[in-house]
Amino acid sequence: MAKDYSRTQRIGDQMQRELAVLIQREIKDPRLGLVTITAVDVSRDLSHAKVFITVMGKDDDAEQIKLNLEILGEAAGYLRMLLGKSMKVRTIPQLHFHYDASIRRGAELSALIERAVAEDRKHQDGSEG
């Protein structure tokens, strides 16, 4: 019977949960916004991990995103050390933070669909009367 999850996926899921707590509790930089970890992709040899984040709030502009990525990049070594203490893994991957724009794109597409449906209804109501 084949495994449903590979080892790298299990480690990535655990890292996602641990990092969410560690970033919230351990990173004391006041410039850091509300960061949400959307995914963690771990390489097969467990040497690198891409950590995908989103930044919530009204300051969802490119400068704020860049600043948050820089702060997390500077704290990557510290976070890796904390992960080493909390996870039962021999080697902890190097952390590389990337912005995940899929949430924003999904919201924009949903808004476009809702607007198109509303315009459709308006046209149907106008043609019936």
From Swiss-Prot:
One Gene Ontology cellular component annotation held by this UniProt entry: cytosol
Keyword annotations from UniProtKB, A to Z: Cytoplasm, Ribosome biogenesis
Predominant location: cytoplasm
Record's subcellular location: Cytoplasm
Keyword Cytoplasm: yes
Keyword check for Chloroplast: no
Subunit structure: Monomer. Binds 30S ribosomal subunits, but not 50S ribosomal subunits or 70S ribosomes.
Role summary: One of several proteins that assist in the late maturation steps of the functional core of the 30S ribosomal subunit. Associates with free 30S ribosomal subunits (but not with 30S subunits that are part of 70S ribosomes or polysomes). Required for efficient processing of 16S rRNA. May interact with the 5'-terminal helix region of 16S rRNA.
Family note: Belongs to the RbfA family.
Record protein name field: Ribosome-binding factor A
Organism, scientific name: Ectopseudomonas mendocina (strain ymp)
Lineage of source species: Bacteria, Pseudomonadati, Pseudomonadota, Gammaproteobacteria, Pseudomonadales
